[in-house]
């Protein structure tokens, strides 16, 4: 058994190549080999969001605070709130972030394939 204590891993500001606005990433866990899963708590300030991206093995978001938006390519922008769970299928192009006037925090869970968990694309 291994316990990861809250606050033992430093917060990191989301890189401007991958995010618009201010985003904070708090690593939660990265399972040891041979497991592939990892997770982070991500906080988006009002209006902040990800660039378009995909995940080779999909992604689960669990909204924990605030109000946000998520959109898949070709779909409508969907409002997401605390308690909502969002699943993006492997290779599904999408973005997610805070609503224009409200911050949003979610836990993001994804798995590595060939050493990567995400493929970043264009920003809007």
Protein language model regions, located:
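Beta-rich strand-turn-strand
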Residues: 77-79, 97-102
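Short acidic-glycine-tyrosine-enriched beta hairpin
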Residues: 74-90
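Short beta-strand His + acidic residue motifs that chelate non-heme Fe in jelly-roll/DSBH
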Residues: 50-52, 70-71, 88, 93-100
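Conserved short histidine dyad/triad with adjacent acidic residue
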Residues: 24, 38-55, 90
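A short, N-terminal "cap"/entry segment at the start of jelly-roll beta-barrel domains
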Residues: 1-37, 117-124
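Short, conserved beta-strand element in jelly-roll/cupin
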Residues: 41-45, 54-70, 109-111
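A short hydrophobic beta-strand segment most commonly corresponding to one strand
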Residues: 60, 87, 101-120
